[in-house]
Amino acid sequence: MLGIPEDPNVGKVLRWAKDKDLYTITLCHGPGALLSTNLDANPFIYKDYKMTVFPDTVDKQTPMIGYLPGHMPWRLCEKLTDLGVKIVNKKSDNSTCIDRQLITGASPLAANELGKLAANTLLQN
């Protein structure tokens, strides 16, 4: 998550994919990359989207349990919500979400369900 939200090249690729109606798939903290679409005064292209994201409440605890070496410098869910995203999960669980061409999974626990959802969605389209 560190560095990717500030990378204008990531934002360019994501805007290109959205313009081409291609699917974007993220897991856990992956939606942090979506923040890059808002760089250089560009509008945030995922405003009003629903998604599952690793919860900020769990990020606050991860250094204590050894998941991360230190505290996150900012709160991902908070930033996404401030940009108009509707976070549909509260826990770091196996929940997934699909909204338009964006497919998301809440945490590593969602990897299997996310893979199934992505595969089935791509096969249908």
Question: What is the role of each PLM region?
Answer:
Residues 1-25, 29-125:
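Active-site-adjacent pocket-lining segments in enzyme domains
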